[in-house]
Swiss-Prot record:
One cellular-component annotation, GO: RNA polymerase transcription factor SL1 complex
Organism: Rattus norvegicus
Residues where Zn(2+) binds: C13, C16, C31, C34
Modified residues (N-acetylmethionine): M1
Name the UniProt record assigns to this protein: TATA box-binding protein-associated factor RNA polymerase I subunit B
Length: 586
């Protein structure tokens, strides 16, 4: 290869902006940094085999690298479809029925594409006058093969004038066409990344990464699976479900840069309230019908969830009878109350896991009052009884339970905070503003990895912690190596008294978490300030809010709403008395 010929070509590489050229056997210039091959060529004469004969083919390896570097033409909706596919696959490995991916989630996603006019409609949204092949009514098979075959041809309510294929063959995803130099986007790796981020239409609900989780939870709710929203978010934290920087699951040929970063790069943990709000918005946008009924034999029924969380926080199983009574008295166990109906005139939404925990908190207040006085008095009586009746079933000792739970809770929270602090947000696949910055981004990433290796060598390699199998329970009290006492079999005998054939709580007092509910347009039900409540009440709220990954104020609000249902008469009397006081003042 003539060095002078390479020096004569001083153009910058269109992929990495470097000026470092070599000549292929075919005589074309290629970038030695990123292996991008240009159209400009130089006639090269090879005398290795036959004198004065020009080689007409490039080596197979270099051609594959060139194809790999250029990537595919892909659309934003394909990116979200890829994320949804991998999220559904992850849920299936966690024990969810395959029907969730193949039927329910597929139908919801197909419906979304139709409602947002991206596919399955007569006039899909076009991109810059370019023919959007991936959005044609008659979808063709693609180079992706079976990897992202999430979309199938199951029935979906069509728009007026829309036509669909009715064959029941294998699912057909959007085709991913090879990237051409003319259609390559300078500002984004995707074809429509810029236009998608700037698209603003009234009534349009743009897909986001948090809304992919909302779609997954809607599918779980439709299937009535044994995974609550708090469980789903916890599995995301444990990196069992793709969410943080979800573009990591994209094939290498799907280049992500520029505007794609704002669409697919998520560098924050999912928030319960945010995902729940997105779930409702997506369900309303899709115009989904009433969901399957949540009956008493379903996992999401408050009676079932109450038993689950009683075992989770090491409380006596006898409390289950009291939680069932509260569920019955408040009416939160009725089918119509629990079942999600997005198109109803009065859309009622239920946070099943938060509601069940609120029932347990209310029962604890009924038993112990939780005023930092009565619970300790009952603990003294239980301790004295247990010392004199060691062979009998022990009575529940609130003080002992508090000590065990505080130690376990503090240790669990410490490990959780350490895991969050050590979490690596940056991926091995760096993001960059444009293809011009690619080489710089990769060099920076390589430098960071080298520094990390050097620091690891200096401080010594920490032993790898074995990853535990996924479980619905975060705390285990029945295992052999727990090292903590289990209170599941303890009795509530000292806390209940018989009245006829019924048992009532020995404690006859109760304090309301909220005396007056806000009626302003801010829609805040109540406020929560720790200084206004007892330490034992704060401790219990902190435990449950940590297990559910929610704010303490959100759980306090749910407890207040439940109390309003249970003590409706008391609230009405308080309301009338406040009105009479206002009259007397005037």
């Amino acid at each position: 290869m003539d060095v002078e010929q390479m020096k004569a070509f001083t153009d910058r590489c269109s992929q990495c902006a470097a000026v470092s050229w070599g000549l292929t056997d075919e005589g074309k210039y290629y970038c030695t940094s990123c292996h991008n091959v240009t159209d400009r060529s130089e006639e090269v004469v090879s005398t290795a085999v036959i004198p004065n004969t020009k080689i007409n083919s490039i080596s197979r390896g270099l051609r594959q690298r060139s194809k790999h570097e250029k990537g595919w033409d892909w659309y934003v909706c394909e990116g979200f479809q890829c994320i949804l596919y991998h999220q559904a696959e992850a849920l299936e490995t966690l024990g969810v029925s395959p029907e969730l991916k193949n039927e329910v989630l597929h139908s919801f996603w197909k419906r979304y594409l139709q409602k947002s006019k991206q596919a399955y409609c007569k006039n899909p949204v076009r991109t810059s006058g370019r023919k959007a092949k991936v959005l044609e009514d008659n979808l063709q098979s693609s180079d992706w093969g079976s990897d992202f075959e999430l979309l199938s041809d199951t029935t979906c309510p069509p728009e007026s004038g829309a036509e669909f294929q009715s064959d029941s063959q294998t699912p057909k995803p959007f085709p991913a066409t090879k990237r051409s130099s003319k259609s390559a986007s300078v500002c984004s790796g995707s074809v429509d990344g810029v236009e998608y981020s700037e698209r603003k239409e009234k009534g349009l609900l743009k897909m986001t990464v948090p809304r992919t989780l909302a779609l997954c939870y809607l599918s779980l709710l439709w299937q009535r699976e044994t995974i609550t929203l708090s469980d789903l978010l916890r599995f995301v934290e444990e990196d069992r479900i793709p969410y943080i920087n979800a573009f990591k699951v994209f094939p290498e040929e799907m280049k992500v840069y520029g505007r794609d970063k704002g669409i697919f790069a998520v560098e924050s943990w999912p928030d319960y309230e945010d995902i729940y709000k997105n779930m409702i918005e997506v369900a309303v946008f899709l115009d989904l019908p009433r969901f399957p009924d949540i009956t008493e034999d379903c996992y999401l029924h408050p009676n079932t969830l109450c038993m689950k969380y009683l075992l989770e926080v090491n409380l006596p199983e006898e409390m289950y009878t009291l939680t069932c009574q509260v569920v019955k008295l408040t009416g939160i166990g009725e089918v119509d109350f629990l079942t999600f109906d997005p198109i109803a005139k009065m859309t009622r939404t239920v946070k099943h896991d938060v509601q069940a925990v609120a029932v347990i908190v209310l029962v604890l207040k009924l038993l112990f009052l939780l005023d930092d006085k009565l619970e300790w008095s009952y603990s003294d009586l239980a301790e004295a009884y247990n010392e004199g009746h060691k062979e009998e079933t022990p009575q529940f000792d609130f003080r002992k339970w508090y000590q065990v739970m505080k130690k376990t809770f503090d240790e669990k929270r410490r490990k959780w905070e350490e895991a969050r602090a050590k979490y690596v947000w940056k991926t091995k696949r760096p993001l960059y503003r444009s293809h011009i910055d690619k080489s710089v981004a990769y060099k920076r990433r390589e430098m960071v990895e080298n520094l990390q290796k050097q620091f690891s060598a200096l401080i010594g390699s920490a032993p790898e912690v074995e990853r535990q199998a996924p479980s619905s329970f975060q705390l285990n009290w029945t295992g052999e190596d727990t090292g903590s006492p289990c209170f599941h079999g303890h009795s509530l005998q000292g806390l209940l008294i018989s009245k006829g054939q019924a048992l009532i709580t020995k404690n006859s007092l109760y304090w309301l978490s909220t005396h007056k509910f806000c009626k302003s347009y801010c829609k805040h039900v109540t406020t929560y300030e720790e200084s206004n409540f007892s330490l034992s009440y704060q401790f219990i709220l902190n435990i449950f809010s940590f297990l559910l990954r929610i704010k303490t104020s959100a759980l306090h609000e749910e407890v207040s709403l439940l109390e309003k249902k249970l003590f409706e008469k008391k609230y009405n009397e308080s309301k009338r008395s406040s009105r009479s006081k206002k009259v007397r003042r005037h």
